[in-house]
Swiss-Prot record:
<feature type="active site" description="Nucleophile">
    <location>
        <position position="50"/>
    </location>
</feature>
<feature type="binding site">
    <location>
        <position position="118"/>
    </location>
    <ligand>
        <name>substrate</name>
    </ligand>
</feature>
<comment type="function">
    <text>Catalyzes the NADPH-dependent reduction of glutamyl-tRNA(Glu) to glutamate 1-semialdehyde (GSA).</text>
</comment>
<dbReference type="Pfam" id="PF01488">
    <property type="entry name" value="Shikimate_DH"/>
</dbReference>
<dbReference type="InterPro" id="IPR006151">
    <property type="entry name" value="Shikm_DH/Glu-tRNA_Rdtase"/>
</dbReference>
<feature type="binding site">
    <location>
        <begin position="187"/>
        <end position="192"/>
    </location>
    <ligand>
        <name>NADP(+)</name>
    </ligand>
</feature>
<feature type="binding site">
    <location>
        <position position="107"/>
    </location>
    <ligand>
        <name>substrate</name>
    </ligand>
</feature>
<dbReference type="Pfam" id="PF05201">
    <property type="entry name" value="GlutR_N"/>
</dbReference>
<feature type="binding site">
    <location>
        <begin position="49"/>
        <end position="52"/>
    </location>
    <ligand>
        <name>substrate</name>
    </ligand>
</feature>
<dbReference type="InterPro" id="IPR036343">
    <property type="entry name" value="GluRdtase_N_sf"/>
</dbReference>
<dbReference type="InterPro" id="IPR036453">
    <property type="entry name" value="GluRdtase_dimer_dom_sf"/>
</dbReference>
<dbReference type="GO" id="GO:0050661">
    <property type="term" value="F:NADP binding"/>
</dbReference>
<comment type="subunit">
    <text>Homodimer.</text>
</comment>
<keyword id="KW-0521">NADP</keyword>
<dbReference type="GO" id="GO:0019353">
    <property type="term" value="P:protoporphyrinogen IX biosynthetic process from glutamate"/>
</dbReference>
<dbReference type="InterPro" id="IPR018214">
    <property type="entry name" value="GluRdtase_CS"/>
</dbReference>
<dbReference type="InterPro" id="IPR036291">
    <property type="entry name" value="NAD(P)-bd_dom_sf"/>
</dbReference>
Amino acid sequence: MAFLALGINHKTASVDVRERVAFTPEQLVDALQQLCRLTSSREAAILSTCNRSELYIEQDHLSADAVLQWLADYHRLSLDELRASAYVHEEHDAVKHMMRVASGLDSLVLGEPQILGQMKSAYAVAREAGTVGPLLGRLFQATFSAAKQVRTDTAIGENPVSVAFAAVSLAKQIFADLGRSQALLIGAGETITLVARHLHEQGVRRIVVANRTLERASILAEQFGAHAVLLADIPQELANSDIVISSTASQLPILGKGAVESALKQRRHKPIFMVDIAVPRDIETEVGELDDVYLYTVDDLHDVVAENLKSRQGAAQAAEELVTVGAEDFMLRLRELAAVDVLKAYRQQSERLRDEELQKAQRLLANGGNPEDVLAQLARGLTNKLLHAPSVQLKKLSAEGRVDALAMAQELFALNEGSTDKSPQ
């Protein structure tokens, strides 16, 4: 048995290459079955995300070249082009790599939790394809356990390390229950999209997306069950908004002190939490002087992110230690597993010899044999039969000068030097 983990990720390959090596969900089952059919892979799973495409494989004998060739052929790449971005991990390193990936230690955003769910999906698809057996299945379960322990025993996932997530985390500190809050998001770019996703996941009661073009706002709003409006509609929406997060490319402020003052009066001075992620700023700085307004800028968030990233990096050291222990423990149990078949066969052989001697003893007793003599004969016969094959093999190994094998036999049978009985002087 041998494990392989190979592929490309955001650190080794450009977006262009990652796009070309990616698998669509519809391709995965057929790709897995083809991979096992055309290479020497007995078990296989594929993890394909925007940041990585990786193959996790169990083989009788390591054959990474054949798998890389298959991957290149499948995506119509030259092998040299793929090799320039690919990495290969074998055996213990493959196990450790899987555990690091599932724990978020190899992610673009250190400690991000989504990768574990993606890993579980990869396992589920491989089971559907029938390409996961007992060994790779055990590795996945050990990987999930290691990732869970990292989440439980370290702080690697506790602090936000993206501006969008930091903004939502600050909102949670201001409002105890986001499920009762309404959010107004200004803009429709990547950052606001991430903010919308985080707010949606936190169960915010209502999200309104305001943008210069209604079409862009509507596309974003549809993803999260939100409501789309134009920038001109912001004054009407402000009075109902507990959370306002803005990130546009406007060169002039979009929200002024007067509009916010008016909204606060309508809200009877119920607090508004505001985050201005834009550069230049979307919200006039004077807004922050108003009572009942909590205004944060992108610089405030970067300070939070930097501090939290430092915290995560400290937690990552502890996480790496847990992963190392997890990988070593798995490999130890795997090596122990290799002895199971041998032990099972030896037990079956011993039980057959025991049954033969027991039947012989029962016949002797039935014919009136002396019980003590029969028991003694049973013990001698069973001992001789159990020792016969090992004795023959040990003599053969000794004749061949296999001192190492003799030493191993002494360890196997727990024989200590000078352990033979000696008559008292």
